[in-house]
């Protein structure tokens, strides 16, 4: 947005638009590491390799859609998906590895994405109903052969018998993704490896073994793509890392056959998260926050933390799923201490908020 670009320029950063998405910019010069910028601190930007932006753009979920990100941490793809579905939609970011879950939640909270919720389950056995998601992004654990600039030992490390459990896990995850996808729904399978067994080989498994239909992808401008390495995988994208000045990446778009009519969500009341104490939205106004900026949903206190629970999640997720909405701050009997990065609910009447003009300091 113009505000974010102005904030970056004010700190001396130079950047240019990327041709493949209006959401993306390429950094050209930085007076200090971009991660230390105000724009990064307040979650206006997310720093990532340009290739990793492509899977959510290839999935391209509709506004208001229900989207599952099966292996979500650190959250860059989850965040972009949440931007695409908007505040009326839902993105569930599942991170099977508990140590990585905190990082996912921290990043999504910094981005102020109220429509994104998180959980932690084995990706191959999620406690979710069949055919319940409009779109699924599966970016599974992989050998990382496309990241040799950062991980030079990746190709040497992941060979032969050591790779077999990874291939088996990827197929289990694809099978689960197919189960969860509604008829007519779309699946993006992506990896940051150049290994054909993990890429084209798995796409052929999805088509021949699971009955999914390939959807040819149009090449994204600004990238160079190598030809797929197996027949039947035409229309999948293999990023040429050297020619594209980006990580090696593979992206395939698949569709589940059947009627494309949306599968209705669960009736409210049949879905729930852990027991919580509901808080009236007007509570926020006492702390310079605007309840009117909340999308439909509930405010809830879990122990000493105030979270937002979006209505689509309350309606869509069954009771068996333990999930968490975005943390807004710390709550106690004395009131609320909003998160220092919370901007999604800032009062639109700024004169009501105490402030310090740094130009006068």
Regions of interest found by a model, annotated:
Residues 64-73, 92:
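Conserved class I S-adenosyl-L-methionine
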Residues 99, 135-176, 192-200, 215, ...:
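Mobile active-site "lid"/loop adjacent to the S-adenosyl-L-methionine
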Residues 85-86, 181-183:
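Helix-to-beta-strand junctions that scaffold the AdoMet/dcAdoMet cofactor pocket
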Residues 74-87:
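Conserved SAM-binding loop of SAM-dependent methyltransferases across substrates and taxa
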Residues 1-32:
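A short N-terminal interaction module
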Residues 1-11, 247, 257-361:
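Polybasic, low-complexity RNA-engagement segments
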Residues 94-130, 138:
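S-adenosyl-L-methionine
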Residues 186-191:
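Conserved beta-strand signature within the Rossmann-like core of class I S-adenosyl-L-methionine
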């Amino acid at each position: 947005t113009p505000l974010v670009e102005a904030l970056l320029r004010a700190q001396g950063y130079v950047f240019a638009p990327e041709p493949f998405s209006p959401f993306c910019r390429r950094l050209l010069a930085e007076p200090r590491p971009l991660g230390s910028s105000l724009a990064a601190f307040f979650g206006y930007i997310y720093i990532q390799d340009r290739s990793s932006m492509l899977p959510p753009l290839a999935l391209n979920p509709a506004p208001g859609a229900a989207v599952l990100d099966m292996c979500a941490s650190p959250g860059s793809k989850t965040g972009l998906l949440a931007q695409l579905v908007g505040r009326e939609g839902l993105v569930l970011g599942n991170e099977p590895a508990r140590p990585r879950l905190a990082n996912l939640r921290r990043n999504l909270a910094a981005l102020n994405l109220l429509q994104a919720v998180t959980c932690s389950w084995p990706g191959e056995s999620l406690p979710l109903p069949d055919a319940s998601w409009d779109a699924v992004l599966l970016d599974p654990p992989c050998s990382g052969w496309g990241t040799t600039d950062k991980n030079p030992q990746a190709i040497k490390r992941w060979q032969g018998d050591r790779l077999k459990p990874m291939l088996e896990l990827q197929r289990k995850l694809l099978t689960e993704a197919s189960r969860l996808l509604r008829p007519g729904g779309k699946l993006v399978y992506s990896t940051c490896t150049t290994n054909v067994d993990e890429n084209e080989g798995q796409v052929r498994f999805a088509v021949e073994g699971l009955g999914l239909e390939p959807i040819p992808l149009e090449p994204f401008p600004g990238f160079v793509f190598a030809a797929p390495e197996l027949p039947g995988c035409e229309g999948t994208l293999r990023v040429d890392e050297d020619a594209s000045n980006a990580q090696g990446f593979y992206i395939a778009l698949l569709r589940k056959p059947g009627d494309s009519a949306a599968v209705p969500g669960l009736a409210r009341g049949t879905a729930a998260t852990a027991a919580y104490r509901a808080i009236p939205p007007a509570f926020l106004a006492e702390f310079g926050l605007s309840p009117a900026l909340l999308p439909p949903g509930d405010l809830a206190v879990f122990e000493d933390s105030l979270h937002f629970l979006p209505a689509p999640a309350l309606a869509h997720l069954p009771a068996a799923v333990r999930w968490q909405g975005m943390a807004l701050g710390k709550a106690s009997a004395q009131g609320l201490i909003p998160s220092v990065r919370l901007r999604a609910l800032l009062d639109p009447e700024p004169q009501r908020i105490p402030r310090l003009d740094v130009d006068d300091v």
